[in-house]
């Protein structure tokens, strides 16, 4: 279970899918996330605590149905956990600040890292560089 949300937010404000993804380690259905096709320049934050996680320059279209990035904004912004669910080994990624579930990282991304951070839109908050507008996933 992820840590409590920051004082300006509370768990009751999360939608059912946001709560399922971030607090219960769930996964949204592919190709349904609000931020999948977002092309604006800006920063992707943790929905729960607003920790900066990814910048738009590292986002790419992997075709997998979830927003994909080739690297986090900072090494400390992400926490990595071995995940043996579904009879396979994967690397789960969580917010390094509040422990909210974000998605998984796979070794099949583009250069320069070769990694694909496959992230649930429902775990993200996007802040537009142009106008500061925020869009919750």
UniProtKB/Swiss-Prot annotation:
Residues 7-129 form the MsrB domain. The active site is at 118 (nucleophile). Binds 1 zinc ion per subunit. The zinc ion is important for the structural integrity of the protein. Transmembrane segments: none annotated. It comes from the Bacteria. One of its GO terms (molecular function) is peptide-methionine (R)-S-oxide reductase activity. The keyword Transferase does not apply. The keyword Metal-binding applies. Keywords: Metal-binding, Oxidoreductase, Zinc. GO terms for cellular component: cytoplasm. Zn(2+) binds at residues 46, 49, 95, 98. It catalyses: L-methionyl-[protein] + [thioredoxin]-disulfide + H2O = L-methionyl-(R)-S-oxide-[protein] + [thioredoxin]-dithiol. GO terms for biological process: protein repair; response to oxidative stress. Its EC number is 1.8.4.12. InterPro entries: Met_Sox_Rdtase_MsrB, Met_Sox_Rdtase_MsrB_dom, Mss4-like_sf. HAMAP family: MsrB. PANTHER family: METHIONINE SULFOXIDE REDUCTASE, METHIONINE-R-SULFOXIDE REDUCTASE B1. This is Peptide methionine sulfoxide reductase MsrB. The gene is msrB.
């Amino acid at each position: 279970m992820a840590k409590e949300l920051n004082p300006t937010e509370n768990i009751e404000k999360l939608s059912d899918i946001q709560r399922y993804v971030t607090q219960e380690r769930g996964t949204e259905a592919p190709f349904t996330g609000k931020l999948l096709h977002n092309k604006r320049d800006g920063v992707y934050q943790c929905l729960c605590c607003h920790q900066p996680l990814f910048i738009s320059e590292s986002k790419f279209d992997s075709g997998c149905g979830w927003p994909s990035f080739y690297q986090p904004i900072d090494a400390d912004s992400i926490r990595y956990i071995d995940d043996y669910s579904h009879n396979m080994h994967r690397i789960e990624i969580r917010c390094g600040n509040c422990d909210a579930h974000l998605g998984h990282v796979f070794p099949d991304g583009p250069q320069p890292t070769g990694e694909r951070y496959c992230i649930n839109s429902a775990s993200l908050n996007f802040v537009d560089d142009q106008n500061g507008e925020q869009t919750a996933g």
